[in-house]
Amino acid sequence: MGQKVHPNGIRLGIVKPWNATWFANTKDFADNLDGDFKVRQYLSKELANASLSRIVIERPAKSIRVTIHTARPGVVIGKKGEDVEKLRAAVAKIAGVPAQINIAEVRKPELDGQLVADSIASQLERRVMFRRAMKRAVQNAMRLGAKGIKVEVSGRLGGAEIARSEWYREGRVPLHTLRADIDYATSSAHTTYGVIGVKVWIFKGEILGGMPAATEAAEPKADKPKKQRKGRK
């Protein structure tokens, strides 16, 4: 059986940025990693209804900065910023350092892999037919400018006795092209028959030149003039 590498992991540093950017000494590394995990876990639970796309964590000078990418910023911020202040206090308590929270709005949720996967999962939990949910997600993504999209659901589809997988694809999804901007995400729907897994791949186009560090290395070096050896004419 052909095994597939994680589409986001293989593109890190090429066309995909990291979700956590910080440096730590050996003794602090495990604590920071554990703090990151607990912060993500807390925010995912608290903002379950806020259409959460991704959480980016930075740690500048003994503090923590969390950027929440969401399609519904109003739900996260709350009235006069009350909710975001509660989140800031909770994150500071979990991490043990002063916290700052930034909100970034996702303009096109139909082109965000995580939001599409969560949307399909929530529809399956509401007993919507899985083929209808898949086709609707694919059509919306293509209508808003995606170059290609693939959706796969697996489990006891439609309450069947034997679990199976079904997928639907439209357009191109070139997983082997490293410069391809592919947004991959997973989600799970907890139904009365069991858990149904959802996977989404969205191809948004190719990023030429890669990330800034890659472009600097790719610049051609000017040829140095060769020195003539002594005694030769």
Curated annotation (Swiss-Prot):
Keyword S-adenosyl-L-methionine annotated: no
GO molecular function, one term: mRNA binding
InterPro entries noted in UniProt: KH_dom, KH_dom-like_a/b, KH_dom_type_2, KH_sf_prok-type, Ribosomal_S3_C_sf, Ribosomal_uS3_bac-typ, Ribosomal_uS3_C, Ribosomal_uS3_CS
Keywords of the record: Ribonucleoprotein, Ribosomal protein, RNA-binding, rRNA-binding
KH type-2 domain: residues covered: 39-107
An example Gene Ontology biological process: translation
Listed Pfam families: KH_2, Ribosomal_S3_C
This protein's GO CC annotations: cytosolic small ribosomal subunit
UniProt keyword Coiled coil, yes or no: no
Function: Binds the lower part of the 30S subunit head. Binds mRNA in the 70S ribosome, positioning it for translation.
Subunit-structure text: Part of the 30S ribosomal subunit. Forms a tight complex with proteins S10 and S14.
Similarity comment: Belongs to the universal ribosomal protein uS3 family.
Protein name (database record): Small ribosomal subunit protein uS3
Species this protein is from: Vibrio cholerae serotype O1 (strain ATCC 39315 / El Tor Inaba N16961)
